[in-house]
């Protein structure tokens, strides 16, 4: 009986480890964050982006499907271009403090976070991203709030905050679908070696 339980536990562990694979990293506020990916039960590509949470350091947002991943990436490119433009305008005009919204809409995301257990929330969106200059230092960020799907009293704010255009670019690069698919295919090939 003990062997059967161990075998089942090992099988579940290895299957779940294969389901989401770290396919890249990016930099956010000076810290390295992970991008994980996997194929969902519906066959769609899922990308999990590690962000910062209000109560939990380990928060992942899930973008489902290539169409939404492309939309998310396109909006990031627009934000990066605005960041570069407005940072230059702020420096050229000696603007040391300003907060201005960037007119983009990110696709809805699922949010997963660790508290006493794993929590999740579906169909979450970000508040309009903002460009911020504080004491001459520019940053870009957005925030969202997730409420646990089964308990309205369990919630989590989640943040994306970049301090440079290069940090934004690192996430854009990490969300390249062809690179993500390549990483997943390599993992599948390695996994299939052991038949």
Q: Over which residues does each language-model region extend?
A:
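Sec-dependent N-terminal signal peptides
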Residues: 3-17
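Positively charged, low-complexity terminal tracts
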Residues: 19-195
